[in-house]
Structure formats: C-alpha cells, structure tokens
Amino acid sequence: VGLMDAQGRQIVQSSRSEPSFIGTMPRTLRSMFQRFPRGSWRPGDVVISNDGYLGTGHLNDVTMVTPVFRGEKLIAFIGSIFHTVDIGGAPSVEARDSYEEGLTIPICKIVREGVENEDVIAFLTDNLRAPDDTLGDIRAQFAAYRQAEHRLLKILEEEGIDDLDGLAGELLERSDASMRQAIRVLPDGLYRDEIKLDGFDAPLTIKCGIKIEGDRIEIDYAGTLSLIHI
C-alpha cells in the first residue's frame, strides 16, 4: 500500500512492500491521470489496471488507486498492487506475447463513488479460473483503502493540518537531498557491467551502465534485449 499526494507523488509506502511495486505505482497513477484527470475523481472511486506497458508489471500484478478527499478538496491518493492467483490466459510456458498470458485490464473505474461497477466485476470474473479468490483479493484492497483513509484523515485532524501539500513537499525535498548526498560520496565516472543468464530459448545478456557526475546518477540498459521469451 502506498500514499501519494494530490499531485500523484509517492510520499509513504509500506516497509513490507515489494520494491518493484513501490517504484511502479506513481508511474501507473500518472497513466491513470491521462484517462481520468484529477478533477474527474470522486470520493469512493477506485481505478484499476494491470497493463504492464503503463507501469504495473506483469498481468498478474493488479494496481488499484482511490482518492482521498477532505471535504470537497482532493488531498491524496491511496493505492496498492496485489498479485492475483489467476488472470486468465493459456496455462502454457510457450506464450509469446501478453495476449496469451492473460486478461489485460484497461484503466477503468471498478468502483464509482462507493458503488462497485458490476459490468467491470462481471467482465473480470467471467474470464478467470478462480473468480471468487480474485474478487476476494480485490475487495480486501477496498477494505484497506477505507482503513487507510480513516487513519490519514484522523492524523490530519489531530495535527491540525488541512492537506498534505506542505508535508509532501518537505518529505520529497529531504529525500532528494539525502539521495544526492549519498551519490556525491561516489567517484565520478562511467561504470559498466553485464551478466549472462541461461535464458529459455537461448542465452541472455543483461547490460547496465551507471554514470555518476556530482550529485547525479544515470542508469541505462543499452544493449539489453527489450523483449525476451522467459
């Protein structure tokens, strides 16, 4: 579970979260903003997607996000990513593209203003081998959002804070400064390495280049295959 400010910048995440999930959630939320601009979100909405090309991961990693309002003002977003036991598709290691791997859920509102979208629910469950298990996972996220929203609003009330704008800015500035300080300790230069894997059809090579310059670091994987069969 992660907490983003009203701009979609992640400021809090569970210490037990997968690093890959922590990193992809803000990117997925930015994609959601293209489909649903921030002004179109309403209290009780939940937006869902598992489209890996938008940042979620592979198809079994489902991202959902809900807005948090204080009065009429949008103050935050709460999101989570969960790995569903089944997402449809052919149970075969011979899958060559995402269409064979399972169902891609486009960005859509699975809950509108607190009411489950029965059409989206039916579309999902009718394409799954374990619909009850997956639907249980989805509704567990709904419950987590309600609890997180309740606790967030309670903290704001207790501390006399209207929104997260100032707090989010301070947290992000401190995080940025801390990371830049850690980078400055490293010698400037360009560092390259590669690892070789057995692969599935043929051996694979993953290449990585790291450029350090002052308080900046750039990482690229030039020379690594973009799409592979695993």
Each predicted region: which residue ranges?
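Short hydrophobic alpha-helical segments used for membrane anchoring or interfacial signaling
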Residues: V1-D5
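Conserved mixed alpha/beta core segments that line enzyme active sites in large multi-domain catalysts
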Residues: R9, Q13, M25-P67, R192-K196, ...
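A short, polar/charged loop-to-alpha-helix boundary motif
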Residues: P19-M32, V85-E94
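A short, hydrophobic, proline-anchored segment that marks a local hinge/packing element in signaling
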Residues: D61-G71, G79, K211
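Mobile "lid/hinge" segments at catalytic clefts and subdomain interfaces of large enzymes
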Residues: L74-L152
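Accessory "access/gating" subregions that flank catalytic or transport cores
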Residues: H150-S226
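Conserved small/polar residues in nucleotide/adenosyl-binding loops
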Residues: I228-I230
